[in-house]
Design a protein with these regions (language model features):
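Core beta-strand elements of the Rossmann-like FAD/NAD(P) dinucleotide-binding domain
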Residues: 8-11, 174-184, 362
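Glycine-rich active-site loop/strand segments that organize a redox cofactor
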Residues: 59-91
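Glycine-rich FAD pyrophosphate-binding loop
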Residues: 31-53
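Active-site-proximal substrate-binding core of FAD-dependent oxidoreductases
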Residues: 229, 233-241, 372-379, 393-452, ...
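Glycine-rich loop(s) and the adjacent beta-strand/alpha-helix scaffold that form part
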Residues: 187-246, 382-386, 390-394
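Mobile, glycine/GP-rich and aromatic-enriched active-site lid/loop segments adjacent to catalytic centers
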Residues: 96, 103-155, 231-380, 385, ...
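N-terminal Rossmann-like FAD-binding beta1-loop-alpha1 element of flavoenzymes
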Residues: 13-39
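Helical element adjacent to the flavin cofactor pocket in flavoenzyme catalytic cores
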Residues: 129-156, 160-163, 168-179, 219, ...
Length: 516
């Protein structure tokens, strides 16, 4: 098997990743200009990215009586001041605006008898959001002069003299290679999951907090192209309902459930209430023999029972099914909780591309928004949209400049360079596709498991209670480099397996050159 031909396309704007930030950026660009857009999406924009399964709340919203600066202070405190305040403020100022726009597109936001949004805490409002990604995708698909290419896996930027010219990839279904040239490129590929050994084994290994298909492609491409990155040591570990990995905030904020240990003691105040402190407290209680730990739901009302079961249907139906299968409502049994494996995700930590307030990266013409952009934690859905909008507005502004095509090199030189890189990548794709089983030592899946085992053992995974030291990190780096060398001899029986090869390579790149 080999790559099935080459498509060369040209556009004003290339958006890599058709998730929350990417789709919203496309809407903004077309609203404010006539620029042509290509969206390259590895899956299908109808159900891709973090919104694929829906959400039951907007977790970043400036509720009545609050102001954007309050949200900045919340995010700073939660991240122990490891933030860029300028990025947080520019995001926070747009949260309500993008929410209103989503409501106009058809998102159902719950309201009280006075017509006000129903708040859930100081920064959240309740929604019926199972179809939120469908709403966003339908809006994008209705735009003129926007081409959405689903099932297109982008593997490399085309960068010359620190200026981006486009990107290269292949179609997972047809096997066609793509060289897409663009004046401006927005990276919106999300964060990275699958770096560490997950909570659940075997068939259920992808039952995780973050989309398992977000493997950090944007991080890896940026690192390989020389873009400045930031704060990859800042990992996100989610506190979730055990086994289902369903969100705990729905219970904690929805019915005011406290974190308790096996003795029935409320332990959350002992350690603190920030995101990291809630996870830390749960880990310490288990280490010290007072586990398992729970969210205390026993004794809530029957109305609250029904409210919780309905809420989880909007984003994590497995939790509702677990209650039904057990024959017990939340009011009859506490909900056991645990920490997930660590993730690299700029929507909850400060890890990702180093960007300015317009979301420009350090590579000319390349922007980053959403979970791939660093410095600005606690984005959630609306924060990703806000960053997509910020980047889009600056892209439009830059496209309108008369000197946009003036570079330090000629167009002929740029074309020659792009074509050469594309040819090299196609050759690389074909090497993986043509290599037979007898010529490779380990399968991609075996190498992935080895990578996750190394990270779990030496780089602070679940198995080591998230703890590590300098010696362990050095060992992790050595072993990851060995696995990276072995990955060069991987093979792929088809184009889908070729995608798996590159997903492995992406994670090894961000671990070996940025994380450990």
């Amino acid at each position: 098997m080999q790559i099935n031909g080459l498509n060369r396309l040209t556009t004003d704007v290339l958006i890599i990743g058709g998730g929350t930030a990417g789709c919203y950026a496309a809407l903004t660009i077309r609203e404010k200009s006539d620029a042509s857009i290509i969206i390259a999406e590895k899956a299908n924009i109808k159900r891709s990215g973090c919104l694929a399964a829906g959400v039951n709340a907007i977790n970043a919203y400036i509720v009545e009586g609050r102001k954007p600066e309050d949200y900045v202070e919340y995010a700073k405190k939660d991240a122990d001041d490891i933030v860029r305040e300028d990025l947080l403020l520019t995001m926070s100022e747009r949260l309500n605006e993008v929410t209103a726009k989503m409501e106009k597109l058809g998102l159902v936001i719950l309201k009280d008898e006075n017509g006000r949004y129903v708040a859930r805490g100081n920064r959240n409002i309740k929604i019926n959001g199972e179809n939120i990604k469908l709403i966003l995708a339908d809006a994008v698909n209705s735009l003129e002069n926007v081409i959405v290419i689903n099932r297109l896996n982008i593997t490399d930027y085309i960068v010359k003299d620190n200026t981006i010219l486009g990107a290269v990839g292949f179609n997972i279904d047809t096997g066609e290679a793509y060289e897409i040239r663009a004046k401006k490129v927005l990276c919106a590929t999300g964060g990275a999951a699958g770096l560490y050994k997950p909570n659940n084994p075997g068939f259920s290994r992808h039952k995780m907090w973050y989309p398992p298909f977000n493997t950090g492609a944007g991080f890896a491409m940026g690192i390989n192209a020389g873009a400045e990155m930031t704060t990859f040591e800042m990992r996100f570990i989610a506190l979730r309902c055990k086994d289902t990995i369903a969100p705990t905030g729905t219970i904690a904020q929805g019915v005011g459930a406290k974190q308790v240990n096996s003795l029935g003691e409320v332990y959350e105040n002992r350690y603190g209430l920030t995101t990291s402190q809630r996870v830390y407290g749960t880990v310490r209680e288990n280490i010290e023999g007072r586990g398992p730990c729970y969210l205390r739901t026993e004794g809530i009302s029957s109305e609250q029972d029904e409210s919780l079961k309905k809420a989880y249907l909007n984003m994590a139906p497995s939790q509702t099914l677990k209650w039904i299968e057990s024959g017990k409502n939340p009011s009859e049994q506490n909900v056991e909780i645990e920490g997930t494996e660590p993730y690299i995700v700029g929507g909850h930590t400060a890890s990702g591309y180093w960007v300015d307030t317009n979301r420009r990266t350090t590579i000319n013409g390349l922007y980053a928004a959403g979970d791939v952009a660093g410095g600005c934690p606690q984005k959630y859905v609306t924060g990703a949209m806000a960053e997509g909008e910020i980047a889009a507005e600056d892209i439009v502004k830059e496209l309108n400049r008369s000197d946009i095509t003036e570079n330090a090199f000629s167009q002929i030189t740029a074309d020659e360079y792009a074509d050469k890189l594309t040819d090299e990548r196609i050759k690389e794709y074909n090497e993986y596709l043509r290599r037979e089983d007898k010529d490779t030592i380990f399968s991609t899946e075996e190498l992935e498991e080895a990578m996750q085992k190394v990270m779990d053992t030496y780089a602070g995974g679940i198995g080591s209670h998230y703890q590590f030291n300098e010696k362990q990190l050095k060992l992790a780096k050595e072993k990851i480099e060995q696995i990276e060398t072995l990955s060069e001899k991987a093979n792929a029986k088809d184009y889908h397996e070729l995608m798996f090869v590159y997903e492995l390579k992406e994670r090894l790149t961000e671990i070996g050159r940025a994380h450990v």
